Amino acid sequence: MAVPPTYADLGKSARDVFTKGYGFGLIKLDLKTKSENGLEFTSSGSANTETTKVTGSLETKYRWTEYGLTFTEKWNTDNTLGTEITVEDQLARGLKLTFDSSFSPNTGKKNAKIKTGYKREHINLGCDVDFDIAGPSIRGALVLGYEGWLAGYQMNFETAKSRVTQSNFAVGYKTDEFQLHTNVNDGTEFGGSIYQKVNKKLETAVNLAWTAGNSNTRFGIAAKYQIDPDACFSAKVNNSSLIGLGYTQTLKPGIKLTLSALLDGKNVNAGGHKLGLGLEFQA
């Protein structure tokens, strides 16, 4: 088996079917460009149709591949500045080190994180240290894989409280066309998902979740159909009768249009449905 995914990426294929291709209640514009010297620019802006709030972000990234270095600068409309420096496969094969910092001039709030990751065949290990004012917190994660089977554990330890504040466990099975994922968070939240690639054009997913002490089970099914190389259609529905529809069309190379709608199946004629529009430019 190849290198297993990180803990955060367990069950990602099913989540992507449920989340990608939708943008309910938003008008969104994304722009990605890359200069000749390898400098990447990514800017994003969105407007919420209900609150009319407009948000935006700008990111620049430069990869110094000779030394395995990546430099990233970030800014958003909350006036938060971020810097990220990553070095990969230099100190040891499979080892990734990241220094991530952010600063908000308006509030004076500062934050710094050191992230480490190590991946080899059958194992993916990560440890992050968040230097918060209240006291550092340590987040660790481990995923083991063997012949398609995956098992992972994630924990968060807060030094200020001197105790583990989060403990999550996951088990799954993965092939190229099928994925099964189950997880337990803090012993109270339970979830599971199934991903199936039916053929080259059709992907389906099912997810369910419930909380201890609550009899309500959350359930949903989703599908994505690739109509042709330039267009795809997505649909999903949950047990609350919320129906999501999405359509993505590549207008020309580097220009992609996304239309989406969220309908309340219990009150189709009552209004209150959400629409979304997205444009992505890449050069």
UniProtKB/Swiss-Prot annotation:
Stored PROSITE patterns: EUKARYOTIC_PORIN
Modified residues annotated as Phosphoserine in this record: S13, S193, S240
One Pfam entry name: Porin_3
Site of covalent link Glycyl lysine isopeptide (Lys-Gly) (interchain with G-Cter in ubiquitin): K12, K20, K53, K61, K109, K110, K161, K266, K274
GO cellular component: membrane; membrane raft; mitochondrial outer membrane; mitochondrial permeability transition pore complex; mitochondrion; plasma membrane
Annotated catalysed reactions: chloride(in) = chloride(out); K(+)(in) = K(+)(out); ATP(in) = ATP(out); Ca(2+)(in) = Ca(2+)(out)
Residues annotated to bind ATP: K12, K20
Residues carrying Phosphothreonine: T19, T107
Compartments, record wording: Mitochondrion outer membrane; Cell membrane; Membrane raft
Site entry (Involved in ceramide and phosphatidylcholine binding. Critical for channel structural stability and gating), positions: E73
Additional free-text comment from the UniProt record: Dicyclohexylcarbodiimide (DCCD) binding on Glu-73 inhibits hexokinase binding in vitro.
Protein name: Non-selective voltage-gated ion channel VDAC1
Gene: VDAC1
